[in-house]
Structure formats: C-alpha cells, structure tokens
C-alpha cells in the first residue's frame, strides 16, 4: 500500500493508554509509511504532570504492545524526548505530524522552529477529542482521577 507520507511523527507521555491514544496512533498509521513516536522522558514528564507517571520503560513497553496491535506490519521507531519538540524540529525527513486538539498549538510551534532552521514545515493532522460516555474528554489524567475516587475502589 502506498501511503501519503513516508515519515510521520507524533509524541506524548502515553501514561495510561486509552482510545484517544489509539485514535492518534491509528491516524499516523493511516497516513504514513514510517512512524516516529517521541515518548517523554521521566524527568521531562515530571515538569508538567501533576502526578508521577509510570516509568519510561513501562510506558515504552505498553506503547510498543499497542502499536503491534494497531499496525503490526508498520515500521515504528521510538525516541525518548527531553523537551516539547524532540527530533521533530531538526529531522528533515519528517513530512507530517499528528496531534490532538490539545497539542495542536505545539505542532504549530514545531513548524515555526523548523522554519527557523530552514526546514520545510510538516503537514499537521489534528484529531478530534475522544470522550467517554459522560462527555468527559479522555486523558490519562482524567482516567487516573476517576480511578482514584473512593467509589471506584469499592468491591
């Protein structure tokens, strides 16, 4: 199958995997031949998360397992990122970036940084928000909060 882009990038913390992550990753596999996933380092995640995320090694293993289910035949590379941009600002091979509505401004910043470096901007694909049955936006933070509620811990 011929894909629209040879190299697609996306990034995130990928702490508690959920259907929003599946949508983000599946979108990347629908448009790109090779997928580069930037996974935040533990130290970088601690600068913006209000809770302690799972260790990098656990998040990476979970992400690899999920990608093997979504697109087992696809070439996927993983890179640990220590800032909001990762290799997206300097890798000239990258042609497209997939982002959520929440992270779309960061994708635009990345393209601005690429322009400053004389690189072509990437095409930006923004996925819509995924909501639970109550209309709440799904996120790892939201899921963690729900699971930590006292009523969630009752048998």
UniProtKB/Swiss-Prot annotation:
Pathway: Cofactor biosynthesis; coenzyme A biosynthesis. It is found in: Cytoplasm. The keyword Ribosomal protein does not apply. One of its GO terms (molecular function) is ATP binding. Keywords: ATP-binding, Coenzyme A biosynthesis, Cytoplasm, Nucleotide-binding, Nucleotidyltransferase, Transferase. It holds the Pfam family CTP_transf_like. It is an enzyme of class 2 (transferase). One of its GO terms (cellular component) is cytoplasm. The keyword Nucleotidyltransferase applies. It catalyses: (R)-4'-phosphopantetheine + ATP + H(+) = 3'-dephospho-CoA + diphosphate. Its EC number is 2.7.7.3. GO terms for biological process: coenzyme A biosynthetic process. Belongs to the eukaryotic CoaD family. Reversibly transfers an adenylyl group from ATP to 4'-phosphopantetheine, yielding dephospho-CoA (dPCoA) and pyrophosphate. This is Phosphopantetheine adenylyltransferase.
């Amino acid at each position: 199958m011929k894909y629209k882009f040879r190299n697609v990038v996306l990034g995130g913390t990928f702490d508690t995997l959920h259907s929003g992550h599946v949508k983000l990753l599946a979108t990347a596999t629908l448009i790109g031949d090779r997928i580069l996933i930037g996974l935040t380092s533990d130290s970088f995640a601690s600068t913006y998360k209000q809770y302690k995320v799972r260790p990098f090694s656990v998040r990476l293993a979970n992400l690899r397992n999920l990608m093997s289910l979504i697109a087992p035949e696809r070439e996927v590379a993983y890179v640990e990122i220590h800032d909001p941009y990762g290799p997206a600002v300097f890798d000239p091979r990258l042609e497209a970036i997939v982002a959520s509505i929440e992270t779309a401004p960061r994708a635009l910043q990345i393209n601005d940084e690429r322009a400053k470096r004389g690189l072509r901007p990437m095409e930006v694909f923004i996925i819509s928000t995924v909501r639970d049955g109550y209309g709440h936006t799904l996120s790892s933070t939201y899921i963690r909060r729900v699971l930590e509620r006292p009523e969630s811990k009752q048998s």
